[in-house]
From Swiss-Prot:
It catalyses: UDP-N-acetyl-alpha-D-muramoyl-L-alanyl-gamma-D-glutamyl-meso-2,6-diaminopimeloyl-D-alanyl-D-alanine + di-trans,octa-cis-undecaprenyl phosphate = di-trans,octa-cis-undecaprenyl diphospho-N-acetyl-alpha-D-muramoyl-L-alanyl-D-glutamyl-meso-2,6-diaminopimeloyl-D-alanyl-D-alanine + UMP. Belongs to the glycosyltransferase 4 family. MraY subfamily. The keyword Transcription regulation does not apply. GO terms for molecular function: metal ion binding; phospho-N-acetylmuramoyl-pentapeptide-transferase activity; UDP-N-acetylmuramoyl-L-alanyl-D-glutamyl-meso-2,6-diaminopimelyl-D-alanyl-D-alanine:undecaprenyl-phosphate transferase activity. One of its GO terms (biological process) is cell division. Its cofactor is Mg(2+). This is Phospho-N-acetylmuramoyl-pentapeptide-transferase.
Amino acid sequence: MHSVFSYLNESLILFLVTVMGFAFLVGIFLGKPVIHWLKKQNYYDQVQKEHCAKLETLHKDKKYTPTAGGVLFFLVLLMSIFFLLPLRKPSTWLFVFSIVSWGSLGWYDDIVKKKRKKGHGITAKQKFIVQLLLSAVTVITVFFIDKENSLFCTLQVPFFRTIFLGSSILAKLFCFSLAMLAIIGTSNAVNLTDGLDGLATGITCMSSFGLLIVAIMSPTNPLAYDVSIVLATLVGISLAFLRYNCSPAQVFMGDTGSLLIGGILASCAVMLRAELFLIFLGGVFVAEAGSVILQVASCRLRKKRIFLCSPLHHHYEYKGIPETQVVARFWMAGLLCTVLGIVAALWR
């Protein structure tokens, strides 16, 4: 195992902690004005859920809670990037593209939900097509930032080491596909996890911190420094948003937040060539998305449900476990996943 201290630069750690603090304070300061604006614009959560009468009953008190609070993530992340990253670097504009594009997709979905009586957003097919395009632009940009492709065709393997897959077309195709899968999968997984007060926000904070450790331990990666700043900002704003999102929530992140978080978190992993670490660090996200996939597959193939309701957190709600207990237990699982991911990074 490498000594973690061999990777830690005291000035870098102090700087990243300062970035976290900056993001936290700005998020706390902007939180109430953003919530007030969302209420004024009537961005309220839609509780009408077809075939989920029990969820409507359980969440009936949430209909007066504003959604689309992800604009807070949008604003603070952009502020941090424009203040702290050099504008001449292509990676800076890749971050800007990721935040603006994924945030805009989520924002549009929230707008559509607001206008429709039953709270339906854009169709899954429409969303997937846009996600496919956005992830492709991100991966292609990373490919061309790395002119020699020595970075793009490497892969950080948990508990093992960083491996070079070669410069063949097959290796590039594999890396391209893995990166696309990571971005699309993570954006949807975070979106599915965002269903209870504070759940997705808390898990985001933990997984972002874990990936930040991976970034710090990737000194040979030319993009690691910039990625670490973005991740430190994401940790800080997540903590600030949790102030307003924990039970009883004053605001929900909505698709504006969940799609943005998933998109930028996975984009950071792609730039670090650490997509496989998302399986550990985002273990709760994986479980939530996996429960939906299994439920749909079982209903179509066996005509039976595996879970009382999916995603997984709703299954436990259906069993009568209070929302705060479900969130607390998922947070504990998320913490264990984060610790496991950090150990996987150190044990190499």
